[in-house]
């Protein structure tokens, strides 16, 4: 073993999700996910959920399932409330989003703050 968990103390990293985030949308997602799957959600689960909400909204705005119309609708969605925040794409179709800062303490990820870009 080169280094133990204590070697990470005081280090920080960013993520899009932490179960420690007190945001009511995040906490509702966690509650619903645990009720359905009987396990804690991970980052991939919350991203899949957010993406599904965005596509569902685009289908609604497109008035159907035509792929071209859905793509156009996705690019026009602004500030759609999803579990991790607000969903918007920039002019190059990249998501505009924030994240969270996590600090490592004694081998445990500790939520520090939410950031918005």
Predicted regions and their residues:
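Extracytosolic ligand-binding ectodomains
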Residues: 1-117
